[in-house]
């Protein structure tokens, strides 16, 4: 169960490291980024709960009438915004004074490692929570959730690198 939960994240970290083979990042920085990703998951949970609490404390309003709207809104406010903002915070904390952040590809590598740390922990929690159908859960999350975190991390790292290495031209992306 544990291997099936972590394998997709490990493979995607291996892939992004392979793509960065010209000037690879130190292994300790990669491990540090994965740990930052794990930590971002722990930070995202209380933020998600607080945001959902703010939204739903108003008596639900449109959410009580339209469950679909509630589900979509919950997915963005309760999942996407807290998760991605915490991963971005961890990326910023890691790279703000990092001497190894010396080329644009590095932003992508570190963002992916943070994202895969987050996705790996999330996968483990989901798979161990679904005791009976753990294989199906692991397979579906391997095909959907982990690649989603990977794609978002690549985009985050790309735009973070643009803002870092080309501050005047891409200043508008600095906080995305």
For each feature predicted by the language model, list its residue ranges:
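Hydrophobic alpha-helical segments at protein termini of multi-pass membrane proteins
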Residues: 1-176
């Amino acid at each position: 169960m544990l291997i099936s939960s972590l394998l997709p994240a490990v493979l995607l970290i291996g892939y992004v490291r392979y793509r960065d083979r010209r000037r690879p990042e130190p292994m300790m920085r990669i491990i540090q980024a994965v740990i930052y990703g794990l930590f971002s998951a722990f930070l995202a949970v209380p933020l998600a709960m607080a945001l959902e609490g703010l939204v739903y404390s108003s008596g639900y309003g449109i959410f009580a009438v339209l469950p679909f709207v509630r589900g979509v809104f919950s997915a963005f406010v309760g999942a996407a915004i807290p998760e991605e903002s915490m991963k971005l915070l961890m990326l910023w904390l890691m790279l703000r004074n990092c001497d190894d952040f010396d080329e644009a590809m590095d932003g992508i590598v570190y963002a992916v490692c943070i994202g895969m740390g987050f996705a790996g922990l999330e996968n483990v929690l989901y798979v161990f929570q679904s005791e009976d159908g753990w294989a199906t859960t692991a397979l579906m999350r391997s095909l959907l959730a982990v690649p989603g975190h990977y794609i978002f991390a690549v985009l985050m790292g790309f735009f973070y690198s643009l803002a870092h290495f080309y501050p005047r031209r891409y200043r508008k992306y600095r906080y995305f």
